[in-house]
Amino acid sequence: MDLPAEALDWLAVWRDVRGLVLAGDLGLPRRLTAAGHTLFALTDDLTLAGRLGSLEKVTPLVARPEAIPADPCQFEVAFAHQNLHRFDLTQALPQLARVLRPGGCLSASYLVRDDTVPWVRRLSALLRRYDPMAMRGDYGHASLEVLAASKYFSDVEERAFRVWQRIGRDDLLSLVTSQPLAANLAPEQLGQLLGQVGELYDGAVRPGESLRLPFQLLGVRAWVDHAELTAPVQPPDSALSIPL
């Protein structure tokens, strides 16, 4: 699902940034370079690194954020979308702080389903009759709280963007069939469940239209504080270095 342009601009902060992206796929790097930004894309997946290298204005770095192979103060913005929780943040956050320029920020985001819409609440309640853990997605966005509490990022801004995905009747039935609970149901039970889901859809949608599945993009801009680094970052006029 594409990020809204407004959200992308907010996460990027400025135009034409020199950025570091913790790459999980090609999606975010493509969007950022299309917006005019120049990127270094960090991944430990050699196959993905090769694909990233084919993109214009993207330089792949084969590494993890716990040990970034870059001099200090190299980037204005570091980006992490849907993957910050996959890393050891006790090591990754000071590394990211080290390679950010003074005044730079780490922009992290997660796309999570919004269960406050009435038809989605009814769907959740229906599925939980069959499996109490249904639709309790763990997206990893608790890592944003870890970032907000980090001493390496003293000022944190938060913002949420609403994102809608159109979903047809067959799409919703396929979505339910793909849930783990479906594999544990007898054919008769699954048929009964799908019938109830179909009735729910028909009762919620307007004639000739499709439903919209709501999501929220949770965004954080965490501004770097170099004062907390063990080895203070002091970029001289002619070069960038960390005095030991």
Predicted features and spans:
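A generic alpha-to-beta junction signature in SAM-dependent methyltransferases
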Residues: V13-R15, T33, V99-L100
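Conserved catalytic/acceptor-binding region of the Class I
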Residues: A97, R101-I167
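Class I SAM-dependent methyltransferase SAM/SAH-binding core
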Residues: R18-I68
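A short beta-strand submotif of the Rossmann-like class I SAM-dependent methyltransferase core
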Residues: V77-H81, L89
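Conserved Class I S-adenosyl-L-methionine
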Residues: A148-L244
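A short acidic, Gly/Pro-enriched loop at the edge of an enzyme's catalytic core
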Residues: E66-A78
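Conserved alpha-helix/loop element of class I SAM-dependent methyltransferases that forms part
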Residues: M1-R18, D25-G27
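A short, conserved alpha-helix within the catalytic core of class I
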Residues: R86-L96
